[in-house]
Amino acid sequence: MENLEKAIARIKEAMPGLELLENENMSAHCSFKIGGPVRALAVPSDVSSLSKICYFLKENQLAPYILGNGTNILFPDEGLKELFIISTAKLTKMFLLPDGAIYAEAGVSLAKLASFAQQNGLKGLEFASGIPGSVGGGLIMNAGAYGGELKDAVESVVLYYLPEQRLYELTKEQCSFGYRSSLFQKMGGCVLLSAVFRLEKGNGEEIAAEMRRLNQQRRDKQPLDLPSAGSAFKRPEGNYAAALIDRAGLKGYRVGDAQVSEKHAGFVVNMGKASSHDVHRLMRDVRKKVYENSGVALEPEMIILPPDYRLEDKGPAVPLHFISSPKQEEDGQGHSGS
């Protein structure tokens, strides 16, 4: 706790223009509308500022938790009094590269990324137009829907590696993408900064029509009018979580103000004043009942944040390409290092 206070004081002194919220309730920063106060929430305006914050935290043997759009996360009611969160909400640069690929920073919403691709006659991200997440968060979990996944469109990512305070570029293959998984979930100390997406040329009107069709399908089937963290459970191999939950008779099952959606059993919704404890108990009950009914052990898809988060100071798990060229500095991807 003492180290955290020192780091906060240092950051305030060195970065007076930084948006820094203290003891901020995280219920206001996630789609579930659940969560107590975090000790500090920083919202840097660019990658250079983000890297400076990370540097000051590392000086005090601390690591931040990186928050995207907060659309697949459950914060604890008790809050996170020893945690420093960095939001990527303002990291929203996006443009076409000379070779036709799309460059997007971590805070760009997936909906805006898909729309930008459509406007430029590029197909392959139609599935992402209705996913309420960001590029950074989406890549960490390899977000997908309707048969598409981000791994199918991404070419490379740039990350800031906290233990070494360096920028690295990873190819798609190095990211080890799997179903709702990636290298970044297993490797501590990674902060995704940006990505390049390689898409195929297509017809803009046809792409827009497909996006409208998928979004209408989403509105028809999903409880978009209630707070949630998206799909509560990962899809088990050869089956669907929603179908298993429905067959177990749990559609509409409720604990406090947390409820298995009556519209789509794969969602847990906040009916008004749900607590994280309500959600924990409901998910435990659902997993137990589904296992008893079908023998399938459901695995949570949403991120359930623990009360503590520490930097694991271990080396890169894969060979990485170090970036330190002046061009990266000009593009806003540079690491200040001090």
Segments (PLM) and residue ranges:
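Conserved active-site and cofactor/substrate-binding residues in soluble primary-metabolism enzymes
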Residues: 2, 6, 27, 45-48, ...
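Structural signature of FAD isoalloxazine-binding scaffolds in flavoprotein oxidoreductases
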Residues: 35-36, 42-47, 74-92, 140-172, ...
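Anion-binding (especially nucleotide phosphate/pyrophosphate-binding) glycine-rich loop
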Residues: 2-135
